[in-house]
């Protein structure tokens, strides 16, 4: 019994990320399309007070808009969903590849080189600027400012 539980736990831990279960109810769990794509009839068509169409026309227009948007989206997603998913998967794979194999190594290389330069810069500052400003500080240390009120 204990061995079965351990094997089941290992199976869950080793589970491939490409086989994770997807939520078919909440298809936007991170709400990335909350304000952008959510367009209803009331967001597009509105009749101001005093210029109303017949109630039947309004109902049929609402139904036509809603049903046509629903089925047009379904048709487009059926025809283009998989090819576009393939395209976007390829694009983000290329971006990830470039980031992992080009951008990060370039940044690390730059940081290594700039660290060497920063040591040389720091040495120059300590060698030339620190004594200069210390001397200027000594020269200016005897300056006294006196404020008087006239009145």
Curated annotation (Swiss-Prot):
MF (Gene Ontology): alpha-tubulin binding; calcium channel regulator activity; connexin binding; enzyme binding; molecular adaptor activity; nitric-oxide synthase binding; potassium channel inhibitor activity; protein-containing complex binding
Free-text description of this protein's post-translational modifications in UniProt: Sumoylation with SUMO3 by PIAS4 may reduce agonist-induced internalization and desensitization of adrenergic receptor ABRD2.
Primary location recorded for the protein, binned into one broad class: Golgi
Pfam families (UniProt xref): Caveolin (PF01146)
Membrane topology: Peripheral membrane protein
GO cellular component: caveola; cell surface; dystrophin-associated glycoprotein complex; endoplasmic reticulum; Golgi membrane; intercalated disc; membrane; membrane raft
Key words, A-Z: Cell membrane, Golgi apparatus, Isopeptide bond, Membrane, Ubl conjugation
Tissues expressed in: Expressed predominantly in muscle.
Subcellular location: Golgi apparatus membrane; Cell membrane; Membrane, Caveola; Cell membrane, Sarcolemma
Annotated InterPro entries: Caveolin, Caveolin_CS
Residues that span the membrane, as ranges: none
Keyword Transferase: no
Intramembrane segments per UniProt: 84-104
Residue(s) of cross-link: Glycyl lysine isopeptide (Lys-Gly) (interchain with G-Cter in SUMO3): 38
Superkingdom of the organism of origin: Eukaryota
GO biological process terms on file: actin filament organization; calcium ion transport; cardiac muscle cell development; cardiac muscle hypertrophy; caveola assembly; cell differentiation; cellular response to ionomycin; cholesterol homeostasis
PANTHER family reported for this sequence: CAVEOLIN, CAVEOLIN-3
Record function comment: May act as a scaffolding protein within caveolar membranes. Interacts directly with G-protein alpha subunits and can functionally regulate their activity. May also regulate voltage-gated potassium channels. Plays a role in the sarcolemma repair mechanism of both skeletal muscle and cardiomyocytes that permits rapid resealing of membranes disrupted by mechanical stress. Mediates the recruitment of CAVIN2 and CAVIN3 proteins to the caveolae.
Stated name of the protein: Caveolin-3
Organism of derivation: Rattus norvegicus (Rat)
């Amino acid at each position: 019994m204990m061995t079965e539980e351990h094997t089941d736990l290992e199976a869950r831990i080793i589970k491939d990320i490409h086989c994770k279960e997807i939520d078919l109810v909440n298809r936007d769990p991170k709400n990335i399309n909350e304000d952008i794509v959510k367009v209803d009839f009331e967001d597009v068509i509105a009749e101001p007070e005093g210029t109303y169409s017949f109630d039947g026309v309004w109902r049929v227009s609402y139904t036509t808009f809603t049903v046509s948007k629903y089925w047009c989206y379904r048709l487009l997603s059926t025809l283009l969903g998989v090819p576009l998913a393939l395209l976007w998967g390829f694009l983000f794979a290329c971006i990830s590849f470039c980031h992992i194999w080009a951008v990060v190594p370039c940044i690390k290389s730059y940081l290594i080189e700039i660290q060497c330069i920063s040591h040389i810069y720091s040495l120059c500052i300590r060698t030339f600027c620190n004594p200069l400003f210390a001397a200027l500080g000594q020269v200016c240390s005897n300056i006294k400012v006196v404020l008087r009120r006239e009145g």
